[in-house]
Amino acid sequence: LKFISKKLINQKDKIIIQELIFKPKISGVIFSSDINNDSPYYIINFDRSGKTNLITSGKKNSSMQTIVIYKETKNLGIFHKLINVIKKFEIIFKDKVLDVEFAVKNNKIYIFQCRNLKKIKINNNDTIKENLINLKKKIIKLKKKNPYLCGETTYFSNMSDWNPAEILGNKPKPLGISLYKELITNSVWAQQRAEYGYKDVRPNHLLINLAGSPYIDLRTDLNSFLPANINQTIQRKLINFFLKNLKRNKSLHDKIEFEVIPTIFDADFEKKIKNTLSINEKIEYKKQLKIITNNILDKKNDILNKEVNKLNKLEKKILQLKKSNLSEIQNIYFLIEECKKNGTLPFAGLARCAFISNSIIKSFVNKNILDEKDKLNFYESFFNISNFINKNLLKIKKGGSKKIFFNKLGHLRPLTYSIESKNYQENFSTYFKDFKFSKNKGRKKFILNNKKEIAINKFFKKNSFKISAKSFFAFAKKSTQLREYSKLIFTKCINEIFINLCSLGKEMNINRKDMEFVTINKLIESYSNLNNSKLKKIFNKEITDNKKNHKILYKIKLPDFIENHKDLYFHKLINVNGNFITNKKIHGKIYEIKLEKKIANLNNKVVLIENADPGYDFIFSHNIKGLITKYGGPNSHMAIRCMELGLPAVIGIGENNYNSLSNSTFLEIDCDLKKVNVIT
C-alpha cells in the first residue's frame, strides 16, 4: 500500500479497500433503468450460488435469475432495502442509467461499485404510469368469467398458440399486429378448429393486444382444443386443471400441445390428464379425441387435398387481382378477404394435420415404439423449401436466371408481417451474398423395420384408427410438406397487400416506414372511401397518433406469461431450457442477425435470431453450424426446418438466456445432453 500511495499523482486521492464478502446470500447487478430504451424499470440480475463474480463474468448458469420491477411499484418483495439504496444513488446521479454491483449477506447490502452508463434521453414516466393503470383494468376485466367459455379465470402467453412473439416480435408496429389478427387470430383459427371437430369458441378472439405486445388468451386457446361433443362438466374440469397446471409450470406456456393439453389421441394421452376426470369421463374424452384424430387421418375424408384446392383458388385470385384495374385500397380489401378464405384457413388446417403427425411420432418415441434416430431420419428424408432454395441458388451461381427463384420465393421476407422488411426479390444481394452450402445436404433414408411397423399397426388397430403404419407416414410426410407449401402461398397475399400499400403510400407521399403505423382496420374501413385526398388525411392522423403511442408502449416491459395485473409491476423472467433439435454436438462462433444492420458472412457460425418466421429461411443457404432463437416452440417453423435439415438448434431459449448468449463470442451446443455452454 505504501508503494501504491507513492505512485498517486494527487496526494489527496484515496485508496479504498473493500472487505471480501464471502458466500453472500445473493449477489448480482442492478440497472436503474432499461439501458436499451430508458424505460422506468429496475432490472436485477442475480444468483444465489455464493459467488460474487458469476453475474459479471457473463457465463450462463441455471442459478441466475432476472427480476424486472416498475419504478413506482410499492411491492418490492425482498428487494426493498436494495432498491432504497439505489434510489439514493439516483438522487446523486440525476437522469442517469446506473449499473450497480451488489451483494446481500446477513440482511446487509454491500455495494461493490456504481457506474454511470448514460443520460436518460426522454422521461415519459407519467404517460407510462397512466398506460399501466389502464392495462391493469383491462387484465382484471379479461380475467372475469366468460359466458362462452369454460374456466374460472385466464392467463396470457406470448407463445402458447400461433407463436405471436416468434412471428411478430415483442412490440410489433400497428400494421403487423392488426394484419395478423385480421388474417388469423380474430376468427380464422377458430373456424378451422370448429371444422375439424373442436369446440367453436367464436366470437372470442385468440390474440389480445396488451400495451402493444401480442398475447394469447389461454382460456380461449384451451377451450378451442376441446372436442365439440364433450359435456360441460368435463369441459370445466379440464380447462381449470390445464390452467392450474400452466400457473404452476409457466415454462410450459410455449409447448402446451405437447406437454399440457391432449388435442388429439396419441400414445401420450394418459400423462396429460392424470387424475382429473372420473373413469367414465375419461372414456368419453378419449372417445371424442379419437373421433377427431380418425377423421383427420382417414383417407376417405381426403382432408389434405381439400385444403390444397383452396390454396390453388387463392393463387388464381392473386393473379386476377394483379391484372385488374382496381384501386390499391380495393385490391387490399379483396386480398385480405381471399387470404382468410383460401389462404390462412387451409394453412391452419394443414398445420393441424402436420402437428397431429408430429405429435403421434413423438408419442411413439416416448413409448419406445420408435427411437429418436427414427424420428430425425424421417424428417430429414424428404425434399423441403431449404432444398429448393439451395438447388436454385446453385443454378443462379452457375449463371442461370433468377426468375424461377423469384416466382416461387421472391415474396418471402424476414418478419413476414412487416412492410418495412424487404423481400427476397428486393434484397437478394443482401440475403444471399456469399452463400455456401453444407457438405452434408443429402437426404436421409427412412426405413421402418418390421418389428416397429407391427407395433405401430397394433397401436392403430387397438384404438380403432383407420390407417396403417405405411399410410400414416405417407400422411405425415405429405402434411408436413403441404404445411410449408401453404405458407408460401398465403404469404404471397401478404406481399401483394404490401405492394399495394407501398403504391398507395407513394401516391400520398407517405413512406414505407410510416406505413407501418397504419392499422389494417383503418384500411378496411376506408374501402368505400376512394378519394385519396381524404384517405391521406385519415392515414396521416393515424400515423401521427400511433407513432406517439408506440414510443410509449415500447417502454412498457411485460413478462412472457401474465398471471395477473401484479405481473405488470413486478415479474421474474422465466428460465427456459429451449427445444433442442437433433442429438448432435457442435461448437462455433456466435453471430446475431439484426435486420437493421448489414448481414456479415454466416459460414460456419452459430446464428442467433430473435424471431423465426419463414422469411429467415435464407440463413440455411449459408452453411451455418447451428441456430438459436429467442422465441419458438417444439412445433414452430424453425424447429421443423432444423429437424428436416438435421441442423443442431435450440429453439425458444427465452429472453434471459438469449440476452446472455448474445453477449458471448463462442459456444457449444450439446443437443443430446440439452445444454448450451458458453466458452468465451
Predicted feature locations:
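Active-site nucleotide/adenylate-binding loops and adjacent lid/helix of ATP-dependent enzymes
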Residues: 1-12
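Conserved divalent-metal-coordinating catalytic cores
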Residues: 12, 23-443, 537-606, 610-625, ...
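Short catalytic/ligand-gating loop segments at beta-alpha or beta-beta junctions
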Residues: 15
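Core catalytic machinery and nucleic-acid-binding channels of phosphodiester-processing enzymes
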Residues: 18-22, 88-89, 519, 523
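Extended, domain-scale alpha-helical bundle/helix-rich regions
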Residues: 360-367, 446-557
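A short, small-residue-rich loop immediately preceding and capping a beta-strand
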Residues: 626-630
